[in-house]
Amino acid sequence: MASTVRPSFSLGNETLKVPLALFALNRQRLCERLRKNGAVQAGSAVVLQGGEEMQRYCTDTSIIFRQESFFHWAFGVIESGCYGVIDVDTGKSTLFVPRLPASYATWMGKIHSKEHFKEKYAVDDVQYADEIASVLTSRNPSVLLTLRGVNTDSGNVCREASFEGISKFTVNNTILHPEIVECRVFKTDMELEVLRYTNRISSEAHREVMKAVKVGMKEYEMESLFQHYCYSKGGMRHTSYTCICCSGENAAVLHYGHAGAPNDRTIKDGDICLFDMGGEYYCFASDITCSFPANGKFTDDQKAIYEAVLRSCRTVMSTMKPGVWWPDMHRLADRIHLEELTRIGLLSGSVDAMLQVHLGAVFMPHGLGHFLGLDVHDVGGYPEGVERIDEPGLRSLRTARHLEPGMVLTVEPGIYFIDHLLDQALADPAQACFFNQEVLQRFRNFGGVRIEEDVVVTDSGMELLTCVPRTVEEIEACMAGCDKALAPSGPK
């Protein structure tokens, strides 16, 4: 009797079971889009190449492998050195796996059969990668659709599939990229379940960090605790990006944590902490930022800046719904920040006039948020016809699209006191006239506050995926060990 067990990925214990049907549905969605494209010939085949193992420079020390995202989206394969082919007309899938030498069994473990991979990944056929040219020749596709296109966040070109003998086939490398990117923009219900999981585990890890942080600790101790929780409780071997664990003036460094500033400052009494960290499960990302006082109690100035950012974050989320233009949400956050900084007394004058001279970008030079999925800055932000807005702040926005159901984005407003941006503003008469320099001086070494939530656009609003303490009262209670269990808010 045939097995009724549906293939799934899980790392055991309490980790999420991800059905391989998720990837079968993705392949189906891609084929349906391609068949509607008038430029796609009958008999076309999609060819994707997975990631390769990499070594550290010239050594034989392997870097932990993580699958290439487009290949993972279509096949969910965790092994390196694979290819995938999808028949566009029928939707049938073929996975090509490496033919491993006998010595592999000595050093790396059991060599699995093709049937093993067919069952593991629920594909229609499995062949060896060194036979891809001969297998495709026997199938005689009219054209091979390969992946080539620019990532609008990095400016890098994705790797196009290549194998010995590909020159014998007719190849088109322009059709596939925009179609598969657009598929990735809109998440299925199964994909959303994984993103809910990555957010739940990462949110729990952030709460553990809040409870553990103490004056005198190193920033990297909090990074270590976050990673340990995500891996031990959630099976997350990877983080979605380099952990950003800022304290004090470092909280004004937007992408702190790099090799030259490796989360190595000692946390001091009176510091604000800004911790931007997200765990990754089965290549699905999360991206969460929490800001809180190192000693567990907000000062008046910390509370004022924090609640300004919280107001902008919550106003944006309550305004989000299908049809909303994302740059308008960035401008809304800017307006609220300037209103609040005026209320605090740091600025004075007309907020409309401040917006005219782009004063908001002095305090929030980055974009309000970005797509999230298999990459932390997920693809699809600027498809053909969507132009980047060349204005301070907005030019850093990673998408300028109108919101649609199924899109997953971060909402991450922030207010930062970045010396060189403040100095530039004070040297510009059009901006300097709004500053109360005596009050500004009080905030010069403040750092900054960012609040980052992950949300999915629904038919009527949005669903909040992140569940961490957010109000001043919730944060102080959590840091005192008196927090209560939180849950995502659900659709709005």
From Swiss-Prot:
Class of this enzyme: hydrolase
Pfam families (alphabetical): AMP_N, Peptidase_M24
Positions bound to Mn(2+) 1: D276, D287, E452
UniProt KW keywords: Acetylation, Collagen degradation, Dipeptidase, Hydrolase, Manganese, Metal-binding, Metalloprotease, Phosphoprotein, Protease
EC assignment: 3.4.13.9
Cofactor note: Binds 2 manganese ions per subunit.
UniProt-annotated binding residues for Mn(2+) 2: D287, H370, E412, E452
PTM annotation (Phosphoserine): residues: S167
N-acetylalanine modifications at: A2
Keyword Transcription assigned: no
Gene Ontology MF, one: peptidase activity
UniProt cross-references to SMART domains, sorted A to Z: AMP_N
GO BP, sorted A to Z: collagen catabolic process; negative regulation of programmed cell death; proteolysis
Reaction(s) the record says it catalyses: Xaa-L-Pro dipeptide + H2O = an L-alpha-amino acid + L-proline
Residues engaged in binding a dipeptide: H255, D287, H377, R398
Superkingdom, natural source: Eukaryota
Complex and partners: Homodimer.
PANTHER family cross-referenced by the UniProt entry: PEPTIDASE D, PTHR48480
Protein name: Xaa-Pro dipeptidase
